[in-house]
C-alpha cells in the first residue's frame, strides 16, 4: 500500500512539472528555417541557410540570438551573405551595417595551429527589440573536390520552436 502511495505521489509530481514546463513561453520563434544543399555539375557544393526569427525576450536579444556564427575555410569555401536585416515590431527595416560582419578565428581552433586558416563570420544583428524579426540568408560555396560528397550529419539544434522547416537537396540530372 505504501509503495502504491509513493508511486502515485511521484506520478502526480511528474504530471505537475511536465504541465508547468510546457506552459513556459519560448524566448523566440523561428517562423521559417530553410537549409538547402546543392551539388553543382562541376563538383562544387553550396549550402544555403535562411531564417526568420522573432524575438520575445531580452535574453533572446542579448545573448541567445543576438549574433550568428558561420564557420568556413576561406582556402576552399566562399561565404556569400544574400541578405541580413532586422524588421522591428513597427515594421521598420534595419539593414545590417558593414561593421556588423566580423571575421574571427573560431574558438575551437584557438590552440590548434593546423586549423588557424579557418574563419568564423560573426554577424551582429542590429536594431533588435522585443518583437523584432531577424532575417538572414547566406550561402557557403565549397570548391570542387573539397567535399567528396554531400554529407549531412547535422542535428537540428534549435532551442526555440520552429513553425516551418525546409530541408532541400538539389542534385544534377
Question: Which residues fall in each region the model found?
Answer:
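Bacterial N-terminal signal peptides that target proteins for export
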Residues: 1-10
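Beta-strand-rich, non-transmembrane domain signature
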Residues: 23-173
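N-terminal signal peptide c-region/cleavage motif recognized by signal peptidases
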Residues: 18-20
Amino acid at each position: 500500500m505504501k509503495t502504491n502511495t509513493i508511486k502515485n505521489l511521484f506520478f502526480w509530481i511528474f504530471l505537475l512539472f511536465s504541465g508547468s514546463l510546457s506552459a513556459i513561453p519560448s524566448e523566440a520563434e523561428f517562423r521559417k528555417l530553410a537549409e538547402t544543399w546543392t551539388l553543382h555539375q562541376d563538383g562544387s557544393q553550396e549550402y544555403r541557410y535562411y531564417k526568420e526569427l522573432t524575438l520575445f525576450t531580452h535574453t533572446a536579444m542579448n545573448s541567445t540570438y543576438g549574433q550568428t556564427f558561420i564557420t568556413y575555410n576561406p582556402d576552399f569555401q566562399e561565404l556569400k551573405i544574400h541578405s541580413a536585416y532586422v524588421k522591428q515590431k513597427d515594421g521598420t527595416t534595419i539593414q545590417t551595417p558593414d561593421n556588423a560582419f566580423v571575421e574571427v578565428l573560431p574558438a575551437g581552433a584557438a590552440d590548434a595551429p593546423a586549423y588557424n586558416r579557418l574563419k568564423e563570420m560573426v554577424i551582429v544583428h542590429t536594431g533588435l527589440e522585443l518583437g523584432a524579426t531577424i532575417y538572414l540568408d547566406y550561402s557557403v560555396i565549397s570548391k570542387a573536390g573539397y567535399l567528396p560528397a554531400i554529407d549531412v550529419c547535422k542535428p537540428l539544434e534549435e532551442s526555440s520552436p520552429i513553425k516551418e522547416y525546409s530541408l532541400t537537396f538539389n542534385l544534377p540530372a
